[in-house]
Amino acid sequence: TIPFPVPGNVPDYVNWTWREYGQRVGIWRILDCFDKAGIPASCTMNAKMALERPRIIQAVKERGWELVPHNWAQNDILTFYADAPKKEREVINKTLQVYRDVVGRPAKGWLSSSLRPTANTLDFLKEAYFK
């Protein structure tokens, strides 16, 4: 799909290319590099990607790497919901549920897409992790 526009009506090529290259090519190169070095790692996981590309999740789990929830989708930036806290909470909870479903346990951490949490993100994560 074509990158969606960000403020200023500019296509968000940064997030689009991170997602597309990373999920199609980059992850397999990274797995090979870490396999050759014998080093385990952590890997971020967008929920949508986990549902659409389960082979990636399986490859990471087989290596014993830690998967870190990373929003619903790479282009679903939490700051879009700065004025819609109910929607942000919904995105976080939906993401964490997919994580539990595909990884088989609750998440241990979080990394917001584009490293952009809102002022509410930590409270919503605390709420989700400590119900």
Describe the role of every protein-language-model region.
Residues 1-131:
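Catalytic alpha-helical scaffold of carbohydrate-active enzymes acting on polysaccharides/glycoconjugates
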